[in-house]
């Protein structure tokens, strides 16, 4: 764990000490995953990992619970497995995906899973809302978006 400045810590949760090989998506599964904590507000930045690494993180002793989850792999079908989502237990999720992207991210199954867990009003998607800005003073969290979405 790295103390960035007083009251702000950053923990690298992935890649593992021994890189994953043979996962079917090694490049994604060895992506950097960070947990940033400022006061009582925490962010889990899940990068491009997929179910393989999410499962690994669930089975480790890392603290995953975070107020904000930046959903893994643009909300692809191979990410945000139920066990991982349950362990993170976010209040807010951000899905970063380009509008009309060729991969169809986020996958409807993942978007629905997040909606069921958090409610639509707590999910922010760059494909629909443009830039998503999260601001915290270490106690409260404010979210603003470039565009409104019904």
Task: Label every PLM stretch briefly.
Residues 1-150:
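Non-globular, low-confidence helical/coil segments that flank catalytic cores
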């Amino acid at each position: 764990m790295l103390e960035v400045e007083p009251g702000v810590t950053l923990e690298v949760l992935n890649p593992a000490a021994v890189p994953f090989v043979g996962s079917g998506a090694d490049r994604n599964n060895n992506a950097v995953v960070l947990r940033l904590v400022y006061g009582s507000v925490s962010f889990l930045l899940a990068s491009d990992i997929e179910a393989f690494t999410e499962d690994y993180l669930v089975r480790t002793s890392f603290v995953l619970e975070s107020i904000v989850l930046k959903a893994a792999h643009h909300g692809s079908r191979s990410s945000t497995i139920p066990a991982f989502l349950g362990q993170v237990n976010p209040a807010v999720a951000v899905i970063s995906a380009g509008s009309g992207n060729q991969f169809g991210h986020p996958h409807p199954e993942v978007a629905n899973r997040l909606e069921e867990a958090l409610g639509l009003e707590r999910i922010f998607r760059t494909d629909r809302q443009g830039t998503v800005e999260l601001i915290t003073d270490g106690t409260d969290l404010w979210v603003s978006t470039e565009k409104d979405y019904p």
